[in-house]
Amino acid sequence: PGKASIGNPAAGSMPHLLAGRLAMLGGFQITNVPFAGSGPAIPQVMGGQLAGMSSPLGDWVQHHKSGKIRILATSGPDRAVFTPDVATFREQGFGELMVREWFGFFAPAGISEAVRQNLNTALRQAMGQQDVRDFVTPLAANLEASTSAEHTRRLAEDSEMAKRLVAALGFKADS
């Protein structure tokens, strides 16, 4: 009941927008508290100064597994392999809040097709190496390669979703 202070890693970030939309859909009010990344907010959540946090899963997995915090939901289409005990928003009746976190590699416009293909090949090879996989596992990241076309499509889809969330929330960036 009332307002709860919910942290996010940056004003206007997808976690910020998702928390705002969850509050709208759930019929409750929150005060969004933006941070410079998730790190500074973690002790405040663990200490009870913040009611919660909307941020990337990898920031919280170790604290969830240790019992210091409880992850309430994940935003992916399926339960995360790192937290199979945590239901998705979709499973909890908030299917609209389905977002996959991803990281992409970008290059300057106008690079040659040969350079683009070489970069793509090198990235795919690196992602297949065990030491790279071992490095990202503690970050709760799944390595998944995509083509440039798939990446472009995902970027467009996510941009459209962000536009809808911004409009629904009436979010205005500080100028």
Language-model regions, residue ranges each:
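Hinge/capping helix and adjacent helix->loop/strand transition within the periplasmic-binding protein
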Residues: 1-40, 89-91, 102-135
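Alpha-to-beta junction loops
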Residues: 2-4, 26-28, 46-55, 68-70, ...
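Hydrophobic residues within well-ordered alpha-helices
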Residues: 19, 44-46, 64-67
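An extracytoplasmic/periplasmic, membrane-proximal ligand-sensing/linker region
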Residues: 24-28, 113-175
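Short helix-initiation/N-cap motifs at beta->coil->alpha
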Residues: 33-43, 56-59, 149
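Short beta-strand and adjacent tight-turn residues that come in two discontinuous sequence segments
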Residues: 35, 54-56, 74, 99, ...
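C-terminal lobe and pocket-closing loops
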Residues: 60-127, 160
